[in-house]
């Protein structure tokens, strides 16, 4: 049978609605950086459906800056990025949850590029990219940016048997967050929340995170501000590894990844 009747009996594929996008930005007393970050988010080629700013107990006007920019403000009284980030992910209403920090400088196509990548790869649960430390001397900043990205990507990847997400520039599916939200160490301020989240995402679904070298953002190089800051970051990394390796050893994580790759 041909003609309109046949077309009605065998309709074409129903278009899939584009995923909605939430951007989560934790902040603590960082109003000036936050203002610049929100201005860049407002100029995206694919505007986010919402921006959620998590005020982690600021004493400056960070919350007022967020509201003035049209962001939804969530208050998280428990200090620490793990608690603040988790509160933002919980509050996000989008199908995709994008994360950056108040000092992140995103390019104009940041949300568009991320949304397109997730649309093209249904099995993808998490996506991340590199950063450039914009507050460092030019040559030194390039060296530090490349070294930091390589160390985090490869050392972190070996530790968790997959690609680690970087909190200044990452995204995940809301359904993936819901699957691990009760497992992450959200109430421990002494862990790296992004690495901890990566451990749990990859335990939930091995080989489900990716690194996009073109998804580059600017970030403040606060890590290099003092020796104390670097020591503190190192201790947090050790704590994050210890907690997650106690749940599942590195060897077993790699076994699970190989098994996942071998499945048809």
PLM-predicted stretches and their roles:
Residues 97:
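Short aromatic/hydrophobic "clamp" motif used to bind/position activated sugar donors
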Residues 1-40:
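N-proximal low-complexity "stem/linker" segments adjacent to membrane-targeting elements
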Residues 39-48:
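Short, acidic, metal-binding catalytic loop of nucleotide-sugar glycosyltransferases
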Residues 109-140:
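Conserved donor NDP-sugar-binding/catalytic core segment of glycosyltransferases
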Residues 129-134, 142-163:
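Short, flexible, basic/aromatic active-site loop/helix in glycosyltransferases
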Residues 76-92:
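Glycine-rich, basic loop-to-helix element that forms the pyrophosphate-binding segment
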Residues 33, 40, 55-63, 104:
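A conserved acidic beta->alpha catalytic loop
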Residues 188-197:
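Acidic donor-binding loop at a coil-to-helix junction in glycosyltransferase catalytic cores
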């Amino acid at each position: 049978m041909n003609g309109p009747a046949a077309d009605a009996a065998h309709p074409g594929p129903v278009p899939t609605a584009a995923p909605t996008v939430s951007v989560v930005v934790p902040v603590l007393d960082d109003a000036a950086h936050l203002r610049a970050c929100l201005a860049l988010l407002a100029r995206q080629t694919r505007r986010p459906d919402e921006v959620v700013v998590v005020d982690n107990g600021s004493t400056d006007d960070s919350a007022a800056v967020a509201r003035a920019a049209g962001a939804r403000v969530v208050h998280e009284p428990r200090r620490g990025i793990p608690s603040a980030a988790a509160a933002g992910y919980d509050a996000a209403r989008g199908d995709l949850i994008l994360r950056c920090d108040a000092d992140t400088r995103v390019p104009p196509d940041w949300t568009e590029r991320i949304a397109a990548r997730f649309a093209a790869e249904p099995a993808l649960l998490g996506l991340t990219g590199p950063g450039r430390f914009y507050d460092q001397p030019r040559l030194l900043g390039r060296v530090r940016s490349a070294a930091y990205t390589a160390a985090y990507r490869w050392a972190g990847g070996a530790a968790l048997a997959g690609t680690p997400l970087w909190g200044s520039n990452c995204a995940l599916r809301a359904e993936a967050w819901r699957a691990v939200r009760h497992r992450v160490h959200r109430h421990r301020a002494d862990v790296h929340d992004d690495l901890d989240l990566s451990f749990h995402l990859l335990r939930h679904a091995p080989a489900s995170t990716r690194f996009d070298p073109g998804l580059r953002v600017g970030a403040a190089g606060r890590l290099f501000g003092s020796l104390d800051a670097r020591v503190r970051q190192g201790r947090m990394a050790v704590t994050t590894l210890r907690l997650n390796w106690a749940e599942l050893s590195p060897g077993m994580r790699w076994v699970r990844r190989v098994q996942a790759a071998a499945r048809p």
